[in-house]
Curated annotation (Swiss-Prot):
Reactions catalysed: Hydrolysis of proteins to small peptides in the presence of ATP and magnesium. alpha-casein is the usual test substrate. In the absence of ATP, only oligopeptides shorter than five residues are hydrolyzed (such as succinyl-Leu-Tyr-|-NHMec, and Leu-Tyr-Leu-|-Tyr-Trp, in which cleavage of the -Tyr-|-Leu- and -Tyr-|-Trp bonds also occurs)
Keyword entries, A-Z: Chloroplast, Hydrolase, Plastid, Protease, Serine protease
Protein name as catalogued: ATP-dependent Clp protease proteolytic subunit
GO molecular function, a single term: ATP-dependent peptidase activity
Name of the gene: clpP
Record lineage: Eukaryota, Viridiplantae, Streptophyta, Mesostigmatophyceae, Mesostigmatales
Top-level enzyme category: hydrolase
EC number: 3.4.21.92
Active site: residue positions: 101, 126
Species of origin: Mesostigma viride (Green alga)
């Protein structure tokens, strides 16, 4: 018998009394997202909507995106991937369990240096799925578009991993499972983590690098102004 989604107490900023919301809504407020099912348009739109909201609410705090999914449609995956690139904040992607097909693509699309896996997680690379069939004429047209999208995804894997296009194409032709060490060597992830404290430390390092970048930029601007005087 299913237990349903648990409710947890949450006090909305500015309110005196806490209210009970489902645990996922509570986590969203903490800037934590989950992809824990097949990726379709509905799931993708929910994730995209939350990312847009969190980015507009505060563009200085990062988002943690946990992934345990067998993948799904290419269009849905590309939508989530593009939104990760679009938002101003860092998006830390974390694989727990399995990130397969388009889910591995989203994992690789996280902020460089912040693409993570737990020790016993796996990623799986293969050809992402296309459409569902129909009349012959439309199936031919769709087949051409599916091939185009697969080629686009292969090129994006090249960009995110540093592997050659030929190797990516070859590895996508079959189910290609990787453990954390293999995924890191391949370029799909940056680190393996074992506990939440490591996530906090990586987040702190990222913020420190951003501050350093701002300081360096300020110094450059000040130097340029001095030279112009």
């Amino acid at each position: 018998m299913p237990i349903g989604i648990p409710k947890v107490a949450y006090r909305i900023p500015g309110e005196a009394v806490s209210t009970y919301v489902d645990v996922y809504n509570r986590l969203y407020r903490e800037r934590i997202l989950f992809l824990g099912e097949d990726l379709d348009d509905e799931v993708a739109n929910q994730l995209i909507g939350v990312m847009v909201f969190l980015n507009s609410e505060d563009d200085t705090k990062g988002i943690f995106f946990y992934i345990n999914s067998p993948g799904g449609s290419m269009n849905a995956g590309l939508g989530v991937y593009d939104m990760i690139q679009h938002v101003n904040v860092d998006v830390t992607t974390i694989c727990m369990g399995l990130a397969a097909s388009m889910a591995s693509f989203i994992l690789a699309g996280g902020t460089p240096g912040q693409r993570l896996m737990f020790p016993h997680a796996r990623v799986m690379l293969h050809q992402p799925m296309g459409g569902n069939g129909g009349k012959a004429k439309y199936m031919v047209e769709e087949s051409v578009e599916v091939k185009r999208l697969r080629e686009l995804i292969a090129h994006l894997y090249v960009k995110r991993t540093g592997q050659s296009l030929e190797k990516i194409r070859k590895d996508m032709n079959r189910d290609n499972f990787m453990r954390p060490r293999q995924a890191k060597e391949y370029g799909l992830i940056d680190h393996m983590v074992t506990n939440v404290n490591e996530l906090d430390e990586l987040d702190k390092q990222s913020n420190d690098l951003k501050k350093l970048g701002k300081v360096n930029l300020t110094n450059i601007e000040t130097s340029n102004k001095s030279e112009l005087k």
